[in-house]
Amino acid sequence: MNTDLTTEQKDYATFLPALSGFYATFIGKQRREEYVDKSRIPYPSMESMNWLNKKEGLFNYHWSLYSAGHAELDINKDAPKEDMIRDRDRNNSWMLGDSGGFQIGKGVWEGDWKDPNCPKAQKKREQVLAWMDAYMDYGMILDI
């Protein structure tokens, strides 16, 4: 049974559930290895919890948000934990990319963000933009 929440919720404002890195990791890594013991998965597979997978998910929802602050920003690196985002069917899903300003504000991302010439901050800016270009349908570049 697959419930299409996009159709069922069409008369309401569009809600973008924020996909956490932990959630994406469970979906992505399970595609390549037994990351979660199968006895702990109540339905045929972990993929049934992937709302971006219209064919195998228990429910489907077209819209989501994902933050660069949770992402593997090296787009040339194989990252199984990112499979839910990187290998999604882009014809049946839409992802808004957040630029990761919270990580800047909390000091998680190194660099002098007030200095437009800081090499560390500039490298991160370039990574975020490349990541958004590669995997997001729309990006909010507000604070990097």
Residue ranges and their predicted role:
Residues 1-144:
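Non-catalytic, usually N-terminal nucleic-acid engagement modules in DNA/RNA processing proteins
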